[in-house]
Amino acid sequence: MIRNSGRILFNSLKNSNVKLINRNVIINSNIRLFSTSTNNTIKESVEKKAETISNKDNIASPSSKSIDVSDLAGNADYNFVFERIKTCDKENYINSLLISDPIARRVAYAIRAFNIETVANDHSPKSEKISRLRLSFWKDAINNIYNGKVYDQPLTRVLAQVIKEKKLTKTWFIKILNRREKDNQQVQIKDMEELEQYADDIHSSLMLLTLEGLGVKGNHDVEHCASHLGKAIGIMVLIRGTVYHLASRKTYIPVSLTTKYGINVESLYRGDPQIEKLQNAIYEMASCAKLHLDKAKQFRGKIPHPATEAFLSVSVVEDFLERLRKADFNIFEFPNTQQHPLLLIKLYKNKFFKQF
């Protein structure tokens, strides 16, 4: 079997475990609508608009007006974002909690909350339409923030605040949204190169925004490391969510791999696991993630503090790949929710010694 000949690729990984998210596609919940106006007519108009959007549709909604950039986030807004991450993205909640600087930590939480809001719940035709509306809203919201106007809504106020404080680059936000829009189409990823590009567009962009929050910008080694680690994380997330994706009639296994190993995608959707064929495909995806992880680790010793705090996820990816190897790349038997306290200890140790 092809995966047996290449398992030596994973021998350098140490055993540890990580608490993973039960659902790898993060599910959005409704964001409350806020109105700062005391004018009853405007208030009633806003509430009427809010009622037209059902809870099931689940679209983040601005108020009927924008607020000026000078009137930004308060404690309630930050608490909303904090609880959003704590509830929906425990893994990055912990990683962001380990960032020492409180302002940089707020930036990390805002960025991760933004990522949550851009993820589709599922890939049904109705959800596809809702996702398009949601992404359109967030693209307008980001453009407005950079033009000095802010939708009167908790996360947009927080984003406006951190963008103003840290001068975050607009390009990374738009890059994430453009990839989400493309992903919203019912098209299977073509090959490994496109898979890497998907991971880079989303997860490397998130990492670069986090680094800007830490005050690190324009460092070639840091950005190169972020690109490789972002690709490794992105591929890990897609592998980890394979079972959930299949249940939603979606797969991120590239066409080149399903063709190479004779995987019938429609049969996968209908419940035929095709375990051995799928193991081979998952092995190749994991090998690609391992390759980028190793390239990121080559920058150890070259990354200045506090940038190292953005790269603590190296330990998370290492743990995932090692546990996947032990499961023989069988995602149907993979302990996806298993937690081991040693991983958290390792994360704290790396933070303390300013390494990754």
Swiss-Prot record:
Pfam families: SQS_PSY. One of its GO terms (biological process) is biosynthetic process. It is found in: Mitochondrion inner membrane. The keyword RNA-binding does not apply. GO terms for cellular component: mitochondrial inner membrane; mitochondrion. Residues 1-41 form a transit peptide. It comes from the Eukaryota. Disulfide bonds: none annotated. The keyword Transit peptide applies. Coiled coil: none annotated. Involved in the assembly of mitochondrial NADH:ubiquinone oxidoreductase complex (complex I) at early stages. This is NADH dehydrogenase (ubiquinone) complex I, assembly factor 6 homolog.
